[in-house]
């Protein structure tokens, strides 16, 4: 949209049929915007250059005299001279009555495959405040703050959603999602009635502060947004629980830390004193 100076709602994203498309390995690994986003950005830039070249040829001016604005290619000093992208597509499709530079291939399209020279993971710091009831072992997350740097934010709302979902998952890792096995190494938790997950009441309002440090490894300056949402959570939540239980001399080296386990650790620590 930015390269072609058009509104996002003028762009149609066609879902690929995996039965006929080239091999793809998924949109995971914090690389979707980095790889696909930059590929689209560069391809749109090539389409933009084609539009400028065709318009310059049609109007008999230099390419630097053409601008792309409002979804049109037009002469800067004479805005009445315009070509729509439809006009340009017709010209590049060899339509009658329209001409293009002799050495220019037909087709108003571009194919670009961008591969970054290195990984572009995001950076983040998580801070959490918890309250622990030493009698019941219950843990309440009072406040959760994240400072996150995913580079240039193309869609801040999507990044925040990614962070919120990751934090909810991480809270499950820290406090709920226990996988137990019997003496024969068989899982004793085999359904979602027994495998606890955090609900909306267990996930606090998450305060997100964005820091945008553009990546130097790609044209858009973007970074991933996946890992920093979930990876720090269990560590910071359990560390906060341990800090709250400092008067009891409790040390925690496991996850998840359930209410039953908290009571056991408090009792064990008290007995050892």
Q: Where are the model-predicted features located?
A:
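C-terminal catalytic domains of large/alpha subunits in multi-subunit enzymes
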Residues: 1-273
């Amino acid at each position: 949209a930015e390269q072609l100076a058009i509104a996002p709602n003028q762009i149609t994203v066609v879902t690929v049929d995996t039965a006929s498309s080239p091999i793809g390995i998924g949109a995971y690994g914090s690389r979707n915007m980095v790889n696909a986003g930059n590929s689209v950005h560069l391809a749109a830039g090539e389409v933009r250059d084609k539009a400028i070249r065709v318009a310059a040829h049609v109007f008999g001016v230099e390419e630097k005299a053409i601008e792309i604005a409002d979804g049109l290619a037009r002469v800067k000093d004479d805005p009445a001279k315009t070509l729509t992208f439809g006009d340009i597509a017709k010209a590049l499709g060899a339509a009658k009555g329209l001409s293009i530079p002799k050495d220019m291939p037909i087709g108003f399209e571009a194919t670009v495959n961008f591969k970054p020279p290195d990984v572009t993971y995001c950076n983040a710091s998580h801070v959490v405040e918890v309250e622990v009831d030493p009698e019941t072992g219950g843990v309440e997350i009072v406040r959760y703050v994240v400072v996150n740097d995913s580079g240039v934010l193309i869609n801040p709302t999507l990044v925040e959603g990614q962070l919120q979902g990751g934090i909810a998952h991480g809270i499950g890792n820290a406090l709920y999602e226990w996988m137990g096995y019997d003496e024969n190494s068989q899982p004793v938790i085999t359904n979602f009635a027994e495998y606890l997950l955090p609900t909306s009441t267990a996930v606090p309002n998450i305060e997100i502060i964005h820091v945008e440090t553009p990546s130097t490894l790609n044209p858009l300056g973007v970074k991933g947004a996946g890992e920093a949402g979930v990876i720090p959570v269990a560590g910071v939540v359990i560390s906060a629980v341990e800090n709250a239980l400092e008067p009891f001399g409790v040390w925690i080296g496991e996850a998840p830390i359930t209410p039953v386990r908290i009571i056991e650790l408090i009792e064990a620590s008290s007995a050892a004193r």
